[in-house]
Amino acid sequence: MTKQENDIQKRFFNDNLQTVDVAIFDAINGEFKRQQHEIELIASENIVSRAVLEAQGSILTNKYAEGYPRKRFYGGCRFVDVVEDLAIERAKQLFGAAFANVQAHSGSQMNQAVFLALLQPGDTFMGLDLNSGGHLTHGSSVNMSGKWFDVVSYGVRKEDQILDMEEIERLAKEHKPKLIITGGSAYSRLWDWKRFREIADEIGAYLLVDMSHIAGLVAGGVHPSPVPHAHIVTTTTHKSLRGPRGGLILTNDETLARKINSAIFPGLQGGPLMHVIAAKAVAFEEALQPAFKNYSANVVVNAKTLAKTLQSNGFDIVSGGTDNHLLLVDLCSKKVTGKRAELALGRAHITCNKNAIPFDLQAPSVTSGIRLGSPAATTRGLAENEFVQVGHMISEVLDGLQMAKSDEDNNAVEMAVRKKVEDMTNKFPLYSYLPIC
């Protein structure tokens, strides 16, 4: 090897990102600044620990490990076997499940694996309607789940936006689905897992609970667990669970566990992402600590506080409040669309997402509401007092938008709120070991 080749070799292993790819470095640094200086209220987002970041950014990204611990199709897997075993055992302990698969790359893929394990194309299943708070993978017509299967959607009552269990039972008995899916991405009330299981048993269906949004609350003991009731439970590992982006599948049924394992590999995926599985294991260990119970309780308290503050300022909250980490704000009475609200709040450095409300007449790209969540801001350290202030800041921006002749006319209000946001976020720094360049 020549000296030049040796230098290149050394640089490959030792040059940092800023040296190798300044464009990507600048984008990451810009995102770091955004996260530091904005209040994150997207319900599906959270902020992970340094330990999770280190695990996910580790040399485990180099290792291929098709198969399962001690049953791999590649050599050199003795250490990644340790990692996956730890992730599995911690997940089982955290949720009180007999079996766990930690290999799903994402929430969509974990649910696809359940379909692959339990259904044939054309089979019937039931899931919560998207406008009632369901998820794309629960039967939306634009998703694979809605294209490959016969979907019967259920929803909420118009008068109170709560799940209509009588109608759900009627639909189940009429259509006799092979699978019933519960859980959603924008439903703020408790689920009656026991009642759903009774309905499933009566018609001979499987019950799948997708607890992606509330898994952290279940782990923290502030939300009823579906694990004793469901045939299969799926969850993403980020959101309220505060881990890396990925999926997790749980069951207490050994036969179903074997089907799930085969559906994930070789049915749906090849090699698992061992660096992500390591980060999942770290997050599960964090969630097993007493501090996580306090965190989960604070997430719910803060969401309730935000909902009550907005209600006191004249905003309509779907279903009248929340029992978990999220709330839907119905903006119809304010004559402001979800799209305009999201953009205006974004200019004020409050991040949320436009969201359809039950029986929404607006297009999905416009919507009549916004979805707000408390997990990320709670992770930063914001407490009830700060969430009251955040509620008032949201009210200022949206009331100003309602009164303004155009979005530009609301600029002074948005900039004044942005200054308040900056003052607040400066008190709650992220990753102080990292320099903001």
UniProtKB/Swiss-Prot annotation:
GO terms for biological process: glycine biosynthetic process from serine; tetrahydrofolate interconversion. Its main location: cytoplasm. The record marks H238 as: Plays an important role in substrate specificity. Belongs to the SHMT family. Gene3D superfamilies: Aspartate Aminotransferase, domain 1, Type I PLP-dependent aspartate aminotransferase-like (Major domain). Keywords: Amino-acid biosynthesis, Cytoplasm, One-carbon metabolism, Pyridoxal phosphate, Transferase. Pathway: One-carbon metabolism; tetrahydrofolate interconversion; Amino-acid biosynthesis; glycine biosynthesis; glycine from L-serine: step 1/1. Its EC number is 2.1.2.1. The modification N6-(pyridoxal phosphate)lysine is found at K239. This is Serine hydroxymethyltransferase. One of its GO terms (cellular component) is cytosol. Homodimer. It comes from the Bacteria. Catalyzes the reversible interconversion of serine and glycine with tetrahydrofolate (THF) serving as the one-carbon carrier. This reaction serves as the major source of one-carbon groups required for the biosynthesis of purines, thymidylate, methionine, and other important biomolecules. Also exhibits THF-independent aldolase activity toward beta-hydroxyamino acids, producing glycine and aldehydes, via a retro-aldol mechanism. (6S)-5,6,7,8-tetrahydrofolate binds at L130, G134, H135, L136. It is found in: Cytoplasm. It is an enzyme of class 2 (transferase). It catalyses: (6R)-5,10-methylene-5,6,7,8-tetrahydrofolate + glycine + H2O = (6S)-5,6,7,8-tetrahydrofolate + L-serine. PROSITE patterns: SHMT (PS00096). GO terms for molecular function: glycine hydroxymethyltransferase activity; pyridoxal phosphate binding. Its cofactor is pyridoxal 5'-phosphate.
